[in-house]
Amino acid sequence: MSGHSSGAHLAGVVLVTDWRKAFNLPTDTVKGGLCCSGMFDLKPVRLSARSSYVKFTDEMEQTLSSQRHLDKLNVPVIVAYGTLETPEFQRQSRDFAAAVKTAGKPVELLVGEGYNHFEIPETLANPYGLLGRAVLAQMGLASR
């Protein structure tokens, strides 16, 4: 499961979904994750100017903040961001990776030196790119 930006937020939610409880699917339906430059704790969104059009309730914020549900995470996760991204995307990615590690779950934090928010996901298309190489290794299809 992979996602970038808002897609990384959604990927994070998918990664902490209890597949057996929600859909009667095997718990290992998802095998691994890549979350690139996403939002994993939605409280800052509610505190920002976006709150004028993003109307979250406390319950929605709690439910959709994947960083708060890491007890349900059961797959390895790659978290990535670029050094030319906004400070909030960088912070959210670092904090998410740290929280996953603290929860005792397998995580790899990748920092794309010189990549902005729109360039870093392009490295997924290249098997030798930062994200492409990491995902192939996570899948057991290439060495690091």
What are these regions, as identified by a protein language model?
Residues M1-R144:
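Alpha/beta-hydrolase superfamily serine-hydrolase fold, recognizing
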